[in-house]
Regions:
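N-terminal Rossmann NAD(P)H-binding glycine-rich loop of SDR-like oxidoreductase domains
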Residues: 4-22
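SDR active-site strand-loop-helix element
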Residues: 9, 31, 59-60, 97-102, ...
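Adenosine-cofactor binding site in Rossmann-like domains, unifying the SAM/SAH pocket
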Residues: 24-46
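NAD(P)H-binding glycine-rich loop region in Rossmannoid oxidoreductase-like domains
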Residues: 38-80, 89-91
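Conserved Rossmann-fold NAD(P)-dependent oxidoreductase catalytic core, especially the SDR/UDP-sugar
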Residues: 84-121, 125, 140
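Active-site Tyr-X1-5-Lys
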Residues: 121-145
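NAD(P)-dependent short-chain dehydrogenase/reductase
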Residues: 138-187, 193-194
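Mid/C-terminal beta-alpha module of Rossmann-like enzyme folds, strongest
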Residues: 198, 205-249, 254, 274, ...
Length: 295
């Protein structure tokens, strides 16, 4: 990237960890939440003054989708108001802001994949707060890049979610002998290692504004789970179910697939197909079936 400093907020998360590994040609500060709470504007100001970054990746977020419904103020504080203050700080410091967002900003009612210029229609507190964060980043940090993505999983897992979807499904498969997974939600499951490489490429290309960055192709959560257990060599029934909304829970879009005409116009490399990405991740994590080994 450059020899100039880079700051990554939410530094202990899945994506941040992969960004940190790929940015090995730059000094990187990647404080976790305990070291830097982005809702603490004074702490953010001190960190920017100490690190003096030319590039800031905001990977901090409150992304427990159902909990956001019950903690609306916290959701907007972390995902929107703190982003506005961070964007203002980046503008003052002349640092480029890269802000991560979500496919949940769309309502999922369309049949085709969503393009960058399609109108958002958030259906949950989480989605609404993330959309507000997008607007804040673009309005208050000149040249900011907002990257929408979804279905993330990575080598480092998510502390707030107890690992990642792949490892959780494999654990349940081995413990329960049967899985029930929604078959009516479509998305493009994306390894954070592939996303990190794509985001860095976008920055190097000088991209600003809004881009969609997800794995190529799409599948349902049910199809994704079937691929996981197949690649792991675990013999288990994966039963398809329909989406239900738990009491007090968030509404999830049935179509979470993102198209990327703007990313393509910028000449950015498409991410690998979701199944290719899954196999690469599982191989690196030691999760692929070993020929002749029992499941």
């Amino acid at each position: 990237m450059s020899a100039r400093p880079v700051l990554i907020t939410g530094g202990e998360g899945q994506l941040a960890s992969d960004l940190r590994e790929l940015l090995d040609d730059s000094p990187v500060a990647a404080p976790g939440r305990e070291a830097l709470d982005i809702t603490d504007d004074d702490a953010v100001g001190r960190t920017l003054a100490e690190v003096q970054p030319t590039l800031v990746f905001n990977c901090a977020a409150f992304h427990n989708v159902d909990l956001c419904e019950r903690e609306e103020d916290r959701s907007f504080e972390v995902n929107a108001r703190a982003v506005k203050r961070l964007a203002e700080r980046c503008a003052e410091a002349e640092a480029k802001l890269v802000h991560m967002s979500t496919n949940y900003v769309f309502d999922g009612s369309a049949e085709a994949p969503y393009q960058e210029d399609d109108a958002p229609a958030p259906q949950s507190i989480y989605a609404l707060s993330k959309l507000a964060g997008e607007y804040a980043a673009l309005a208050y940090a000149p040249g900011a890049l907002v990257a929408r993505t979804g279905g993330l999983y990575g080598q480092y897992g998510s502390a707030s979610k107890g690992g990642n979807f792949v490892t959780r499904m494999l654990q349940r498969a081995r413990e329960q002998g049967e899985l029930a997974v929604v078959a009516d939600q479509r998305l493009s499951p994306t390894p954070t290692a592939d996303l990190a490489a794509a985001v860095i490429e976008a920055v190097r290309a000088g991209a600003g504004g809004l881009v969609h960055l997800t794995a190529s192709g799409s599948c349902s959560w049910h199809e994704f789970t079937e691929a996981i257990v197949e690649l792991a060599g675990v013999e288990v029934e994966v039963r398809p179910t329909e989406t239900t909304r738990p009491p007090g829970g968030a509404r999830r879009p049935l179509n979470g697939v993102l198209a990327r005409p703007r990313a393509d116009a910028l000449g950015l490399t498409p991410l690998p197909h979701w199944r290719e990405g899954l196999e690469s991740y599982m191989e690196a994590a030691g999760l692929l079936a070993v020929s002749g080994a029992p499941s």
